[in-house]
Amino acid sequence: MSEQKLALNEYLKIDSDYLRGDIQEGLDTQVTGSFSDGDQQLIKFHGFYQQDDRDLRNERKEQKLEPLHSFMLRARVPGGICTPAQWLEVDKISSTLTTSNSIRLTTRQTFQYHGIPKRNLKTLIQGLDRAALDSIAACGDVNRNVMCNPNPVESKLHAQAYAVAKHLSDHLLPHTRAYAEIWLDEEKLLGTETVEPVYGKTYLPRKFKMAVAVPPHNDVDVYTNDLGFIAVSEAGELIGFNLVAGGGMGSTHGEVETFPRLADDFGFIKTDDVTKFAEAVMTVQRDWGNRVVRKRARLKYTIVDHGYDAFKAEVEKRAGVKFEPKRDVIIGDRGDRYGWVEGIDNKFHLTLFIESGRIKDMPGQTLQTGLREIAKIHKGDFRMTSNQNMIIAGVAAQDKAEIEGLARKHGLLGQVLSGTRGHSIACVALPTCPLAMAEAERYFPEFIDHIDALQAKHGISEQSIVVRMTGCPNGCARPFAAEIGLVGKAPGRYNLYLGASFEGTRLNKMHKENIQEAEILAELDTLFGRYATERDAGETFGNFTVRIGVVKAVNDAAKDFHA
């Protein structure tokens, strides 16, 4: 392929001196709250995105002011685990260095800050560093935050799986010192050449997402990742993983060459071979991935374009190990288990529902204060889940009452929570996300109220339904793997997707395009009525919509999703 055909981002990476670019110069320039267009792409590798308040965009334009620029920073927290001391620093930063005065738990088991003025970026990153946290590779064309099932019951197996996730996260970090030089004031070592042994000078063609699942729970939505490891155990001990690859949610409205996809099963690998296979998959993607058309640059398209067999053979060649036949595992619920759960270590774990992951103080719900007070006395750890919730983990029996009392006092516990609400997530969308076409987080609680009311009307409130909403088709809340998926098309308008499996092993398919709330609810009212009277015993809503022909099953995303 000729150099002239490469996507613009490829040239930016080549010329960036291993992700340094002109970020330092942009940081020193305070006459504008933004970075240059090129550096806006490079800062993603450092963990943050440039945004602006879209609610104020037109008003500021009329006043001949530049947009109210700010930044969203996402931390790297493998497996979502941090200490109470770290959480107190995370909390302090949100209150002193952001304009949102909140913390947002993400769908990838980490947290992010919104509303960071450019002048506060360096201070914020240094604050994270003091707490042994960072935002390296939380965004950009690299391996992002590695997810791992925060399973509080099978804690021994979880610990083993978490160790793998943490190792992969650390091992696959970029080697460039750009982050340390720019944000932590480390001196650049003259005469030394940066070498990226896995990534190379141009890193990956696109983002790369990885997850470790511990069956039967699939809260990490393992099949939606570029690379997934499904733990296989014998007698409670980890012996290896089923490897899956080629998942991803992002697509573009109206462009049939883009589509969401679930990962393919490739086979079983031993625990000792995980690093070899992870590197092999990533380097095949590095070398085979599309660097001309970014919309077709994810691993899912690489596998589709080159073929499953060719991709598998190349991965085995680079790993130096053959896949064994995949082992039988049960893939089950994707939700979190709310309330207290006892672990095998005689410790207790309290899962708290955080609506859309937004931690802030509101009338009647002082969530941020509550978690701060818990962190001051808690002796275990905090575990963020991929459903945007928080687990207060490792609580001794004698400490339960005090922890629970604080949680109830601050509205973190005691909510009336339907099964559907507990299984549902939404992305941030407006007003900060520049890609959002419609509301998500701000509207989602009200929308779920309507869903709860319809389920009650038809006597199906006991049935949990996975509902997800995003403001655009990039799919940050994994809407295409939801039994009911709403994807923003325009203000107040969404595409309605139906038919995914409850367990996350089948995608959904568009049922209605560009419709408003009234039509969405009318469609669901009718379908809930039929589901109440026509469902088979134990049949989930997603499976029901496929069985009765409301939508066709998506078995091969490249062929079926847009058909």
From Swiss-Prot:
Reaction equations catalysed: hydrogen sulfide + 3 NADP(+) + 3 H2O = sulfite + 3 NADPH + 4 H(+)
Cofactor: siroheme; [4Fe-4S] cluster
A cellular component annotation (GO) from this entry: sulfite reductase complex (NADPH)
Enzyme class at the top of the EC tree: oxidoreductase
EC number annotated for this UniProt entry: 1.8.1.2
Taxonomic superkingdom: Bacteria
Record-listed siroheme binding positions: C476
CC cofactor note: Binds 1 siroheme per subunit. Binds 1 [4Fe-4S] cluster per subunit.
Pathway(s) per entry: Sulfur metabolism; hydrogen sulfide biosynthesis; hydrogen sulfide from sulfite (NADPH route): step 1/1
Keyword annotations of the record: 4Fe-4S, Amino-acid biosynthesis, Cysteine biosynthesis, Heme, Iron, Iron-sulfur, Metal-binding, NADP, Oxidoreductase
Residues involved in [4Fe-4S] cluster binding: C427, C433, C472, C476
Keyword Amino-acid biosynthesis set for record: yes
A Gene Ontology BP annotation from the UniProt entry: hydrogen sulfide biosynthetic process
InterPro entries membership: CysI, NiRdtase/SiRdtase_haem-b_fer, Nit/Sulf_reduc_fer-like_dom_sf, NO2/SO3_Rdtase_4Fe4S_dom, NO2/SO3_Rdtase_4Fe4S_prot, NO2/SO3_Rdtase_4Fe4S_sf, NO2/SO3_Rdtase_FeS/sirohaem_BS
Gene Ontology terms, MF aspect: 4 iron, 4 sulfur cluster binding; heme binding; metal ion binding; NADP binding; sulfite reductase (ferredoxin) activity; sulfite reductase (NADPH) activity
Subunit structure: Alpha(8)-beta(8). The alpha component is a flavoprotein, the beta component is a hemoprotein.
Cross-referenced PANTHER family: SULFITE REDUCTASE [NADPH] SUBUNIT BETA (PTHR11493:SF47), SULFITE REDUCTASE [NADPH] SUBUNIT BETA-RELATED (PTHR11493)
Family: Belongs to the nitrite and sulfite reductase 4Fe-4S domain family.
Described purpose of this protein according to its UniProt entry: Component of the sulfite reductase complex that catalyzes the 6-electron reduction of sulfite to sulfide. This is one of several activities required for the biosynthesis of L-cysteine from sulfate.
Protein name (Swiss-Prot/TrEMBL): Sulfite reductase [NADPH] hemoprotein beta-component
Native source organism of the sequence: Shewanella frigidimarina (strain NCIMB 400)
